[in-house]
Regions:
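Bacterial Sec-dependent N-terminal signal peptides
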Residues: 1-25
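Aromatic-residue-lined binding/catalytic grooves and analogous aromatic/hydrophobic interfacial grooves
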Residues: 24-450, 456, 465-469, 474, ...
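Membrane-interfacial loop-to-helix junctions in multi-pass inner-membrane proteins
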Residues: 477-481
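Catalytic cores of eukaryotic secretory-pathway lumenal/extracellular enzymes that build
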Residues: 499-500, 514
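C-terminal, helix-dominated tail/subdomain
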Residues: 508-544
């Protein structure tokens, strides 16, 4: 694709996944860098790497390093949908209360009889952690930890015992592995022990040949048993020294340099299919990866990453604070005209999308692909009343158009599960999406009515389909997604009702997300946001039908 140079701050109408960090970029070479002079002490200080399937938060502690690990399909629960069949009977009653101005009573009735009863969707969950312990390195100097946005790698460097050590961390776009490359400026100095742990249930940790293996099953949630089977597998190659796996610990001794390779696989194949073989997939993936030396895999990863990241350059001026750590620049941003920090924040958003939304993978959740909790905030799901959309605001405008593919796959999936929900809850044709979905593509109205009684998520999703066509002019793509746009419109057309107080057609009940009105409720009729979304969708469907 054509390289684009953006010279205006107006290009910063973008959003990033919810990972805290920002930092100092540059103009040429390896210059877009987030850097720090101390290890991470908490999860939000660790640095994110990812290839859309595997994510890691890298702490960079010299004596006891930690990589918190995620695999995109490790979610609680199992295939299901959560539409409430009671809704079809009670929605007309809720609507009548709205017409009477009894908004609080309408909202309470909807919470009791319209919202999902089985579950509110499943949480995204962690695989666990890789710990790498380096004996004798508790004392160190000259510490530096950085995330290079130009090469999509984290680097940790420090001096201990008179030896300079360096670690490179990559979640490879060219192979489904995370690599940790260990070097020193003196031969025979790489000695460490690596092991994996997990907060998940029924976990088994073992050694197989020169590999360590951790397998388990995802967690229960809201009475739904977890059925995602997963296997994590790691090994190491060295120049000099030895590698031994014993009792679930990978032992590297006296190496000149070493590379740890790690992969994770699950039995997930599709939202309604968990028949995959995680054991076989993980074994084959790891064995294929170690056939190539680190330098070769690193170059392949770099080439693929740069083919996407390198399309856009934003130049806001000279970097005046390159010698300052990123956390200092963030802390003092309000005191300085640090335009370069703004530039890097823009590129950091693009980096995060590249790390979380490659074609053929799941879309980024509320936290991208990075999560260390079994029950994260808002379950780290796909929240469709702005958050999922926000993740993709940079995609077209920042020249990452093909990274919309995971979102479009999700839309296709929820158009299937949402068809069942439309019939069950509303007695309507077409498909419906409320304000959240998950790996299993549930489409029922979840949580309580004040936040979840919102049936126009499909209209907002469809805007991204139309936007992609406008940016690409791809008529074949438009033809392939037209049924999803049309059927989202069909549902809304069939569920619109005439307000007896003014004879206008509108959606009722609904709400304006996170925006209560003076009647001590959010439940309402004909909210402005719905009107705008419906107008856009109907207009786009009509125009698409003529192309």
């Amino acid at each position: 694709m054509k390289r684009i140079i953006l010279l205006s701050a107006a290009a910063l109408t973008l959003a990033t996944a919810a990972i805290p960090a920002a930092a100092a970029p540059g103009k040429k070479g390896n210059s877009h860098i987030l850097w720090y002079d101390k290890p991470a002490t908490m999860w939000t200080e660790a640095l994110p790497i990812g290839n859309s399937r595997l994510g890691a938060m890298v702490y960079g502690t010299p004596a006891a390093d930690r990589l918190q690990l995620n695999e995109e399909t490790i979610w609680a629960g199992r295939p299901n949908n959560n539409a409430n069949p009671e809704a079809r009977e009670y929605l007309p009653k809720v609507r009548e209360l709205v017409w009477q101005g009894k908004y609080k009573e309408a909202q309470d009735m909807a919470t009791a009889h319209v919202m999902a009863k089985t579950n509110s969707g499943m949480p995204y969950q962690p695989f666990g952690d890789l710990y790498i312990n380096f004996p004798g390195q508790d004392n160190y100097t000259d510490y530096r930890r950085e995330l290079s946005l130009d090469s999509a790698r984290v680097v940790t460097e420090y001096k201990s015992g008179g030896v300079n050590f360096k670690r490179e961390y990559i979640s490879s776009l060219s192979g489904n592995v995370i690599m940790v490359h260990l070097t020193a400026d003196r031969k025979g100095m790489i000695t460490c022990n690596a092991n994996m742990i997990s907060p998940q249930q029924d976990v088994t940790i073992a050694s197989e040949g020169k590999e360590i293996v951790l397998s388990g099953i995802s967690g229960w949630h809201e009475g739904l048993k977890g059925k995602v089977l997963f296997t994590g597998r790691a090994t190491a190659t060295t120049i000099g020294g030895t590698v031994v796996s014993k009792d679930g610990v990978l032992q590297i001794k006296g190496a000149d340099e070493a590379t740890i390779y790690l992969t994770i696989a699950t039995n997930f194949r599709k939202y309604n299919d968990i028949s995959g073989n995680d054991t076989l997939i993980s074994r084959n993936t790891l064995h294929e990866a170690v056939k190539s030396p680190f330098a070769q895999l690193k170059q392949k990863h770099y080439d693929l990453y740069r083919s996407q990241f390198g399309r856009v350059c934003l130049d806001l001026g000279k970097d005046l604070y390159a010698d300052r750590t990123t956390d200092w620049r963030v802390e003092h941003f309000k005191e300085h005209n640090d335009e370069h920090l703004v530039e890097t924040y823009f590129q950091f958003g693009r980096y995060l999308l590249i790390c979380t939304s490659q074609p053929g993978t799941q879309p980024p959740t509320l936290q991208g692909i990075w999560n260390d909790k079994m029950l994260p905030s808002w379950d780290s799901k796909y929240t469709c009343n702005i958050n999922l959309e926000m993740n993709y605001w940079p995609a077209e405008v920042a020249n990452l158009s093909e990274l919309t593919a995971p979102l479009f796959s999700l839309i296709k999936d929820v158009s299937e599960t949402g068809r069942e929900t439309a019939r069950t809850m509303y007695g309507a044709d077409g498909w419906v999406l409320h304000h959240n979905t998950d790996l299993w593509r549930v489409t029922g109205a979840i949580d309580k009515a004040p936040s979840g009684l919102w049936p126009t998520g499909g209209a907002w999703m469809a805007q991204h389909l139309w936007e992609h066509y406008l940016y690409t002019g791809d008529k074949q793509f438009l033809a392939s997604v037209y049924p999803e746009m049309r059927d989202a419109a069909r549902f809304l057309n069939q569920t619109m009702v005439r307000n007896p107080n003014n004879t206008n057609w509108m959606i009722c009940p609904s709400l304006s997300p996170e925006n209560p009105h003076p009647h001590h409720a959010t439940t309402a009729a004909g909210v402005t946001m719905d009107n705008e979304l419906i107008f856009d969708l109907f207009s786009h469907v009509i125009e698409a039908s003529r192309i």
